[in-house]
C-alpha cells in the first residue's frame, strides 16, 4: 500500500476479484506527494489525515490561533503499546514514560502561551485539560533528552558520579599508553577507540612483549583492538555500576508505571487531546509554510465556486476560476486541453476542504460543499488476470455506486471502452438515476451525442475546453454553455503525425461530420461574443450605479452641511438675543449699546462673503447653459435674476444668472452632456479600526467611513471591531444590516483578522 490514509473517503469503488486493494483517492487525484508533504508536519507518524473533531469547531480554533501561532511539539511515537502495557499491569520502559512526558510538556507549554487569551474558545479547550499533581512531578523528573534529572534520585546520582569518575580514569590510562615510548612502535595511531563499550588501543602485531591485555577485536587491516590489563579492572567496575544504574532505573519505572496505572483513563484522554492538538498545529504550520488557505466546507449550499484554485501537482499552474452551480458538469472540448486536470481539481478541492487541509485558493470568494463520500473513476480498470476489460471494469465500478446518495462523483473519459452510440444511451440512463439521488457528478467526454442528450436536463451544465486556432494550441480556458470540439486532427499534427496522413484521415471523416464541427465552432464563437457583450453591459451598468450612488451620497452630505449650518446660525442668533435681553433687563444704556455692537459682531461672522457679480446674462426657457463645469438646461425664469436649472443627472436647483454662462455654438444634433465626475474623498481608506471606541462613537465613524468609501468607488472595505465581549460586533452587524448600500458582509479570512474583522461589499 502507499502511505496514503487508510480511512480515506472510499477512494475507488471496490476491490478486484483477487482482493487487490484499490488505488487511494489522493493517488487518483495526484495528491499523493502533497499529502505526504503535509504529513511531515505532524509530531506523530500517522496513517490517517481525517479529523475526529467537529469541523466547525476545528475551523474556529484555526481562526483564533492563526495570528498567535502554535509551537511545534517534539516528535513522538505511537501510544497504543503504552496503553496495552498499563492495562495489563505491565512496566513501561524509561523511553515509553518519556513519550508521556513529551505530550504533557507540550500541553503545559500551550496552556502557558494562551494564559492571557481568556476570550478564545481554544483557551477553554486547553483549560479543560487539568493535570493531576502526579503528572506535574513526572514532568519535573526528566530533562529534555529523556534522562532522569540530577537530584531526582540520590542513589542514581551517586552511581552516575562513580561511573563518570571511572570513565575518566579509563580514558586517562588509555592516553598514558598512547604516549608511551615503549609502546610507540606498535601503535597504529594515538587515538582512543571505543569497542564493545570499552576504551581501547589499536596495535600492530608483536605487542605482547610490551603490554598485557585482552584483544577485543581485529580490524579489517589485521590490527588489534586491545584493552590494557590495568584498564580491564576499571572496565569491570564500570560494567558493574552500569548494571546497578539499570536496576535503579527499573525500580523507578516500576514505581512510575504503578502510579500511571491509576491514571489510565486520563492517559487515554491525554493521548486523544494531544493527537488533536498535533493535527491542529500541523495544519496551521503547513498553511503558513506554503502560503495556503483553509476553506470551511458548506453544509447548506450545493454549488461549488472556486476562485484562483491551483492543483498542488502543477508547477506553474493557471489558477482555476469556476462556478459549478448545478448537479452535473459535462466537460468537452480539445484533447490535452485540461479537462482531466479540471476534473481532478474539483475533486481535490472537495477532498482537501472536507479534511480541512489548506490549499492554494482565494478562500474568501470560494464555496465548497461538504460531501459525505467522494469517488473518482479516472484510471483504466482493465485487468487481464481477472478477465476484466475496460468497459466491464467501468460497469463494475458504476454498479457499486447506483445506491449511493449525497456523493461527489468524477468520471474521466466516460465513453471509454465501447461503442459510442450505445454508450451514450447507457450512460444517460445511469447518470440520470444518480442525479435523482441528490448526487453531484463531473464527467469529461468526447461524446457529442451524450453531451446533447444530457444538455436537455436542467440540472446539467456544459463546459468546453477552448482551442486557439491561430497558435494551434489549447488555451487551458473553458467556456460555459457550449459543446466543445475535440480537435483530434490538430492535436495529432501537433504531436508529430505527418500532415499527409492527417489530410487522408479528414477525407475518410466525411463532409457531413466536418459541417457538424463547423456548426459547433460557430456556436462556440457566438457564445464567446455574447459573453463579451454581456460583460461590457454589466460594466456599464456598474458604472451608472456607481454614479447614481455617488450623487445620492453627495446630496445627503449637502443636506447634512445645510442642517449643521442652520443649527449654527440659530445658536448664534439665540446667543446674540440673550445678550440683548440681559442688557435691557439691566437698563444700562451705555452698556446696552456696547452689547448691541458685540451682538452685531457675532452675527457678522456668519454673513456670507460671496457677492453676486453685477455681470448678468439673460437666458430663455429651454435654453442650454453652463453651470460651473456642467451643461444644464434652463427650466424656468424666476424673479431677481434667478433661474430654475436641470443638471444632466436630472437634479433641479435654483441658480443666479451670474453663475450661468452661454454655450457658444451649441450642437445642432442631440444634446450630449459631458460625463460628470464626482470628486472622490481625499481621505478615503479601505480599512476602519473601531477597537476601543464606544458604541455611539463607533457608529458615527462607521457611517462617515462608508460614505467616503462609496464616494471613493470602493466595492469592498474592511471593518475591524475586535473579538472582545462582542458588544461592538453586535452594533456593527446591526448597522450594516440596515444600511441601504451594504450588499453583504462576512468574517474576514484568518490572515486578515478572522472573526474580529468584517469584509463589507458595497
Swiss-Prot record:
Q: Which GO terms describe its biological process?
A: mismatch repair; negative regulation of DNA recombination; rescue of stalled ribosome
Residue spans with biased composition (Low complexity)?
A: 9-20
Q: Which GO terms describe its molecular function?
A: ATP binding; ATP hydrolysis activity; ATP-dependent DNA damage sensor activity; double-stranded DNA binding; endonuclease activity; mismatched DNA binding; ribosomal large subunit binding; rRNA binding
> Which PROSITE patterns does this UniProt record tie to the protein?
SMR (PS50828)
What segment(s) does the record annotate as region Disordered? Answer: 1-22
Its activity is regulated as follows:
ATPase activity is stimulated by DNA.
Which EC numbers does the record give? 3.1.-.-, 3.6.4.-
Stretch forming the signal peptide: none
Q: What happens when the gene is disrupted?
A: Mutants have a significantly increased frequency of intergenomic recombination. They are more sensitive than wild-type cells to oxidative stress induced by agents such as H(2)O(2), paraquat or oxygen. They also have a reduced colonization capacity in a mouse model of infection.
Write down the SUPFAM superfamilies for this protein, in alphabetical order: DNA repair protein MutS, domain III, P-loop containing nucleoside triphosphate hydrolases, SMR domain-like
Q: Name one Pfam family in it.
A: MutS_V
Question: What positions does the domain Smr occupy?
Answer: 688-762
First-level EC class: hydrolase
In this chain, ATP is annotated as bound at 333-340
Superkingdom of source: Bacteria
InterPro entries found in the cross-reference section: DNA_mismatch_repair_MutS_C, DNA_mismatch_repair_MutS_core, DNA_mismatch_repair_MutS_sf, MutS, MutS2, P-loop_NTPase, Smr_dom, Smr_dom_sf
Q: Which UniProt keywords are listed?
A: ATP-binding, DNA-binding, Endonuclease, Hydrolase, Nuclease, Nucleotide-binding, RNA-binding, rRNA-binding
Q: How does it assemble?
A: Homodimer. Binds to stalled ribosomes, contacting rRNA.
According to its UniProt record, which protein family does this protein belong to?
Belongs to the DNA mismatch repair MutS family. MutS2 subfamily.
Summarizing the function annotation, the protein's role is: Endonuclease that is involved in the suppression of homologous recombination and may thus have a key role in the control of bacterial genetic diversity. Also involved in repairing oxidative DNA damage. Has ATPase activity. Binds DNA.
Q: What is this protein called?
A: Endonuclease MutS2
Query: Gene name, please?
Result: mutS2
Amino acid at each position: 500500500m502507499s502511505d496514503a490514509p487508510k480511512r480515506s473517503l472510499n477512494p475507488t469503488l471496490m476491490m478486484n476479484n483477487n482482493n487487490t486493494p484499490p488505488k487511494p483517492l489522493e493517488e487518483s487525484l495526484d495528491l499523493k506527494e502533497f499529502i505526504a508533504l503535509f504529513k511531515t508536519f505532524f509530531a506523530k507518524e500517522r496513517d490517517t489525515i481525517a479529523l475526529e473533531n467537529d469541523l466547525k469547531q476545528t475551523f474556529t480554533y484555526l481562526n483564533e490561533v492563526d495570528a498567535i501561532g502554535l509551537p511545534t511539539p517534539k516528535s513522538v511515537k505511537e501510544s497504543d503499546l503504552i496503553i496495552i502495557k498499563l492495562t495489563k499491569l505491565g512496566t513501561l520502559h524509561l523511553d515509553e514514560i518519556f513519550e508521556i512526558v513529551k505530550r504533557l510538556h507540550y500541553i503545559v507549554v500551550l496552556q502557558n502561551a494562551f494564559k492571557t487569551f481568556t476570550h478564545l474558545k481554544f483557551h477553554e479547550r486547553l483549560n479543560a485539560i487539568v493535570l493531576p499533581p502526579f503528572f506535574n512531578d513526572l514532568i519535573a523528573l526528566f530533562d529534555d533528552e529523556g534522562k532522569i534529572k540530577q537530584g531526582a534520585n540520590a542513589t542514581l546520582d551517586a552511581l552516575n558520579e562513580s561511573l563518570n569518575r571511572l570513565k575518566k580514569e579509563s580514558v586517562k590510562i588509555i592516553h598514558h599508553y598512547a604516549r608511551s615510548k615503549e609502546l610507540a612502535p606498535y601503535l597504529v595511531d594515538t587515538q582512543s577507540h571505543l569497542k564493545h563499550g570499552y576504551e581501547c588501543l589499536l596495535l600492530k602485531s608483536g605487542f605482547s612483549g610490551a603490554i598485557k591485555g585482552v584483544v577485543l577485536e581485529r580490524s579489517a587491516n589485521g590490527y588489534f583492538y586491545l584493552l590494557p590489563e590495568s584498564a580491564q579492572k576499571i572496565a569491570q567496575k564500570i560494567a558493574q555500576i552500569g548494571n546497578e544504574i539499570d536496576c535503579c532505573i527499573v525500580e523507578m519505572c516500576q514505581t512510575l508505571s504503578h502510579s500511571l496505572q491509576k491514571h489510565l483513563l486520563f492517559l487515554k484522554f491525554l493521548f486523544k487531546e494531544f493527537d488533536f492538538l498535533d493535527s491542529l498545529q500541523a495544519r496551521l504550520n503547513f498553511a503558513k509554510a506554503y502560503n495556503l488557505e483553509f476553506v470551511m466546507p458548506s453544509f447548506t449550499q450545493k454549488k461549488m465556486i472556486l476562485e484562483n484554485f491551483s492543483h498542488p501537482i502543477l508547477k506553474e499552474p493557471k489558477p482555476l476560476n469556476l462556478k459549478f452551480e448545478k448537479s452535473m458538469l459535462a466537460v468537452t472540448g480539445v484533447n490535452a486541453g485540461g479537462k482531466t486536470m479540471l476534473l481532478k481539481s474539483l475533486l481535490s478541492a472537495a477532498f482537501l476542504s472536507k479534511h480541512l487541509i489548506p490549499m492554494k485558493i482565494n478562500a474568501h470568494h470560494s464555496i465548497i460543499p461538504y460531501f459525505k463520500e467522494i469517488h473518482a473513476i479516472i484510471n483504466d480498470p482493465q485487468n487481464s488476470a481477472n478477465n476484466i476489460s475496460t468497459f466491464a471494469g467501468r460497469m463494475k465500478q458504476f454498479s457499486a455506486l447506483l445506491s449511493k446518495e449525497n456523493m461527489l462523483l468524477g468520471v474521466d473519459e466516460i465513453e471509454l471502452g465501447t461503442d459510442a452510440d450505445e454508450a451514450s444511451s447507457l450512460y444517460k440512463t445511469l447518470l440520470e438515476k444518480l442525479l435523482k439521488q441528490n448526487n453531484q457528478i463531473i464527467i469529461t467526454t468526447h461524446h457529442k451525442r451524450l453531451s446533447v442528450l444530457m444538455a436537455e436536463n436542467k440540472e446539467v451544465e456544459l463546459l468546453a475546453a477552448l482551442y486557439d486556432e491561430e497558435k494551434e494550441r489549447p488555451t487551458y480556458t473553458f467556456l460555459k454553455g457550449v459543446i466543445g470540439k475535440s480537435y483530434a486532427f490538430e492535436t495529432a499534427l501537433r504531436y508529430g503525425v505527418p500532415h499527409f496522413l492527417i489530410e487522408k484521415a479528414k477525407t475518410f471523416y466525411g463532409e457531413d461530420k466536418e459541417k457538424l464541427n463547423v456548426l459547433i465552432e460557430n456556436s462556440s464563437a457566438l457564445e464567446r461574443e455574447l459573453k463579451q457583450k454581456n460583460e461590457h453591459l454589466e460594466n456599464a451598468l456598474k458604472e451608472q450605479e456607481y454614479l447614481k450612488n455617488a450623487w445620492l451620497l453627495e446630496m445627503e452630505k449637502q443636506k447634512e452641511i445645510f442642517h449643521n449650518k442652520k443649527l449654527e446660525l440659530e445658536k448664534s442668533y439665540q446667543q446674540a438675543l440673550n445678550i440683548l435681553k440681559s442688557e435691557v433687563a439691566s437698563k444700562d444704556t451705555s452698556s446696552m449699546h456696547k452689547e448691541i455692537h458685540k451682538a452685531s459682531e457675532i452675527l457678522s461672522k456668519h454673513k456670507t462673503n460671496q457677492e453676486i457679480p453685477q455681470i448678468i446674462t439673460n437666458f430663455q426657457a429651454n435654453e442650454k447653459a453652463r453651470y460651473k463645469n456642467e451643461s444644464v438646461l434652463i427650466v424656468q425664469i424666476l424673479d431677481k435674476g434667478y433661474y430654475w436649472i436641470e443638471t444632466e443627472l436630472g437634479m433641479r436647483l435654483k441658480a443666479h444668472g451670474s453663475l450661468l454662462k452661454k454655450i457658444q455654438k451649441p450642437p445642432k444634433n442631440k444634446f450630449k452632456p459631458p460625463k460628470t465626475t464626482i470628486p472622490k474623498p481625499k481621505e478615503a481608506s479601505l480599512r476602519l479600526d473601531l477597537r476601543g471606541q464606544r458604541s455611539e462613537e463607533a457608529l458615527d465613524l462607521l457611517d462617515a467611513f462608508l460614505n467616503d468609501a462609496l464616494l471613493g468607488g470602493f466595492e469592498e472595505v474592511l471593518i475591524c471591531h475586535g473579538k472582545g465581549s462582542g458588544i461592538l460586533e453586535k452594533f456593527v452587524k446591526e448597522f450594516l444590516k440596515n444600511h441601504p448600500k451594504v450588499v453583504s458582509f462576512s468574517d474576514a479570512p484568518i490572515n486578515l483578522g478572522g472573526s474580529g474583522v468584517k469584509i463589507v461589499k458595497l
